[in-house]
Amino acid sequence: MDNVRNFAIIAHIDHGKSTLADRLIEECNGLEAREMTNQVLDSMDIERERGITIKAQTVRLNYTANDGNRYCLNLMDTPGHVDFSYEVSRSLAACEGSLLVIDSSQGVEAQTLANVYKAIDNNHEIIVVLNKVDLPASDPERVKLQVEEIIGIGSSESILISAKTGLGIRDVLEAIITKLPAPQGNINAPLQAILVDSWYDPYLGVVILVRVKNGVLKKGMKIVMMSNNAVYQVDNIGIFTPKKVMTSELSAGEVGFITASMRKMADCKVGDTITEEKKPCGEALPGFKEIHPVVFCSIFPNKTDGFKYLREALEKLHLNDTSFTFEAETSNALGYGFRCGFLGMLHLEVIQERLEREFDLDLTATAPSVIYEVTTQSGETLNIHNPNDMPDSVKIKIVEEPWITATIMVPDQYLGEILSLCDERRGKQEDLSYVGNTMTALLKYKLPLSEVVLDFYDRLKSISKGYASLDWEISNYQESQIDKLSFLVNGEPVDALACIVHKSRSEKRGREICARLRDLIPRQQYKIAIQATVGGKIVARETINPYRKDVTAKLYGGDVTRKMKLLEKQKKGKKRLYSVGNVDIPHNAFIQALKIGD
């Protein structure tokens, strides 16, 4: 065990984590030159296209150090986006040390702070790595000062590297050997392993990633899941190099994967402790903090027979990503679908895109919403995230909405516009300070979550030309003036368009959606009325005029009463059509109507 090192790479988005992982794999000959690709650990197409890491990945490397000894390094590459911070927490719990990667041209950013504090909470030894030193804008001395002043870590021994060119990579590997501690554990003790992650493999079935704390995990061993006492027999044991390599056992301090012919996805709960059936350990390891979704939306298949396939796809994805939730629901307008909960808007987009790509589904998603706490006149407290579950306004006593504490780092020249954006989103400023001797402002704001989840991050990046960074965490619930905005098309309610908005925005939002629907719904033979209502009161209306068929075209001259008779007959026909005709709203109309901020 003295020759094992478990470490994670943590950083803000785009500071070069995955590129550094590529260079470490290359240096340790993890893959042959012809097998190397950029972002080799980002296995999903969507990760490579967006240039982001979504799933934390693990890889075992063998490295011969300058002291002549051969070391086994278990590397975890983690995501940097705030939506995927739970992936970072899980990876850190399986390691003893962290490489803190900072872009030497950008400096310390909001997620750098959030992730380094997580590492400190896990008692990690931290090695500071300043990346991109080959860039003309690189300023390592300024960034070293920032690290000491903001984070409070001594940066005199920071390693200067360029993950792109490979400069300084060997120094990083030597620092991992000399500065990071070896894992603690007893090989002779009863088996005690923590379940770090799980996913579905089409060939192997359910695959579980484990970190063995004590004892030895062997092929053929009968294991017990301590959360529910489910018993399974281990079929395969392996490690990632980053290719799958089968092995016969994993001993204390090692990270690897196992398969055990699991049938129930509920049996592989992330954070659970695995032990041996014959010789169980005395107690379970402390698990991970439960994470709860904060953004909800409904997803419906566009094909009538798509519900069954959507359920199967969600179940398989849920195995790979336990952080989102889903439950079946039905809509008058869109049929059968699922109400899903996510950790943020990027998480929602990624899951929807994976469903469409990996499972070839055609989907419609409704407007995102957060969880509101509603206290009724009778004193009952309800948690509402679906607008159609909101009680009538006369039955509501108080509505409370979630607020967050946001940490925003922004260059001084964009500060005014960012402050205006936060105020426009009903924010309350808590603190404004400057980072060390730099021209970077550190803002602390309290903001309603509903104002942040939609397009706040995009607006923040767009105003600051990409330089601002954001990190946030749920703070508390506060009383708020909330309306349920409903829509009627020809007097019929369209439940899929309903949304929950702040009172100050309801009329403006109603007008926007009505205007969009007017342009999106095809014209009919009769007039179509589109109305937005709040508590039974109409706040906005648009009308789609009918096609006009010229029924008098065949007449020439003659008595005017003949013309009047034909027009009267047309009017009666349209009236009859209006009373029985259902307006067919195209699926893309729902998507376009609910788009925000464009």
UniProtKB/Swiss-Prot annotation:
Species of provenance: Wolbachia sp. subsp. Brugia malayi (strain TRS)
Function comment: Required for accurate and efficient protein synthesis under certain stress conditions. May act as a fidelity factor of the translation reaction, by catalyzing a one-codon backward translocation of tRNAs on improperly translocated ribosomes. Back-translocation proceeds from a post-translocation (POST) complex to a pre-translocation (PRE) complex, thus giving elongation factor G a second chance to translocate the tRNAs correctly. Binds to ribosomes in a GTP-dependent manner.
PROSITE patterns: G_TR_1, G_TR_2
SUPFAM superfamilies to which the protein is assigned, alphabetical: EF-G C-terminal domain-like, P-loop containing nucleoside triphosphate hydrolases, Translation proteins
Domain tr-type G: 2-184
Pfam families registered for this protein in UniProt: EFG_C, EFG_III, GTP_EFTU, GTP_EFTU_D2, LepA_C
Membrane-protein topology: Peripheral membrane protein
GO molecular function: GTP binding; GTPase activity; guanosine tetraphosphate binding; ribosome binding; translation elongation factor activity
Similarity comment text for this entry: Belongs to the TRAFAC class translation factor GTPase superfamily. Classic translation factor GTPase family. LepA subfamily.
A single Gene Ontology CC term: plasma membrane
UniProt catalytic activity: GTP + H2O = GDP + phosphate + H(+)
Places the protein is found: Cell membrane
Name of the protein: Elongation factor 4
List of residues binding GTP: D14, H15, G16, K17, S18, T19, N131, K132, V133, D134
Enzyme Commission code: 3.6.5.n1
